[in-house]
Swiss-Prot record:
Keywords: ATP-binding, Kinase, Nucleotide-binding, Serine/threonine-protein kinase, Transferase. It catalyses: L-seryl-[protein] + ATP = O-phospho-L-seryl-[protein] + ADP + H(+); L-threonyl-[protein] + ATP = O-phospho-L-threonyl-[protein] + ADP + H(+). It is an enzyme of class 2 (transferase). Gene3D superfamilies: Histidine kinase-like ATPase, C-terminal domain. Pfam families: HATPase_c_2. CDD domains: HATPase_RsbW-like (cd16936). The keyword Kinase applies. Belongs to the anti-sigma-factor family. It comes from Bacillus anthracis. This is Serine-protein kinase RsbW. GO terms for molecular function: ATP binding; protein serine kinase activity; protein serine/threonine kinase activity; sigma factor antagonist activity. HAMAP family: Anti_sigma_B. SUPFAM superfamilies: ATPase domain of HSP90 chaperone/DNA topoisomerase II/histidine kinase. Its EC number is 2.7.11.1.
């Protein structure tokens, strides 16, 4: 039997000025579900990073859309952020994901590439699917003891 859930879908233009709408919507949904304040703040950062990556990288000069789906389950919130823009070499980027050497001065940290590390750190699970565009599925559990620790929290799927 399939697990029951409610779904909220949104589409916004892939422009920076619309990211706050998604962040505020997610915060309202998470608050209604009973998430703790700190978890809501973590999810706000994660969804902002995912959307900002699309705004900056997916469509280059073209105008595109960001599709967002919230899956409201009894014990978790799943957030899917997707675009149909230009995909990139995810495996190459994944190999460069933090943690970063704290002995290096801040000036030597890369300007890009922290978003995926932040999302991975702040969410309980993250899956990234890439083929045409990019889809990021982020999960946050209401009760953290339900999180599995398999040592590889980022997984990737390629469409065939």
């Amino acid at each position: 039997m399939m697990e029951r859930f409610e779904k909220i879908e949104m589409k916004i233009p892939a422009k920076a000025e619309y990211v706050a709408i998604i962040r505020l919507t997610m915060a309202g949904v998470a608050n209604r579900m009973g998430f703790a304040y700190d978890d809501i703040e973590d999810m706000k950062i994660a969804i902002s990073e995912a959307c900002t990556n699309i705004v900056q990288h997916a469509y280059k000069e073209d105008v595109g859309e960001i599709a967002i789906v919230f899956g409201l389950y009894e014990n978790r919130l799943e957030i899917m952020v997707a675009d149909n823009g230009v995909s990139f070499d995810f495996n190459n980027l994944r190999s460069k994901v933090g943690p970063y050497d704290i002995s290096k001065p801040v000036e030597h940290l890369p300007e890009n590439g922290l978003g995926l590390y932040l999302i991975n750190t702040l969410m309980d699970d993250i899956q990234i699917m890439h083929d045409e565009g990019m889809t990021v599925l982020m999960t946050k559990y209401i009760q953290r003891e339900q999180v599995e620790n398999d040592g590889n929290p980022i997984s990737t799927y390629e469409s065939y």
